């Protein structure tokens, strides 16, 4: 048990040191993509496919963390069921979007 605890503490210290050297990581979830259809069981793949069709910038695509799908129901703009995807990415506070 003593060696397990030491290993866990050692890993935590490495994690802490890495974050102190690199700076604080900032996570942003404001990339909104709308589309036709419902979210369904493969909603993350639907959102990622829509994101990759039109990424905001090549640098941002490197730090993409994932997307979440929200059903929006029937809306006149889409002439049927629709959904909205919110995509998140992260960057280091000392080096934005890189």
Swiss-Prot record:
InterPro entries: SCRL
Main location: secreted
Keyword ATP-binding attributed: no
Signal peptide: 1-23
Keyword Phosphoprotein: no
Protein name as it appears in the record: Defensin-like protein 241
Localization: Secreted
Disulfide cross-links: 29-88, 39-69, 47-85, 67-87
Family designation: Belongs to the DEFL family.
Keywords: Antimicrobial, Disulfide bond, Fungicide, Plant defense, Secreted, Signal
Domain of life: Eukaryota
GO CC annotation terms, alphabetical: extracellular region
């Amino acid at each position: 048990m003593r060696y397990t605890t030491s290993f866990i503490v050692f890993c935590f210290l490495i994690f802490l040191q890495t974050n102190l050297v690199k700076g604080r990581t900032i996570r942003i979830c404001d990339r909104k993509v709308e589309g036709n259809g419902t979210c369904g069981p493969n909603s993350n793949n639907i959102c990622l496919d829509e994101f990759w069709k039109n990424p905001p910038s090549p640098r941002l695509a490197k730090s993409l963390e994932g997307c979440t799908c929200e059903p929006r129901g029937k809306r006149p703009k889409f002439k049927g069921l629709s959904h909205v995807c919110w995509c998140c990415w992260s960057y280091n506070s000392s080096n934005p979007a890189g």
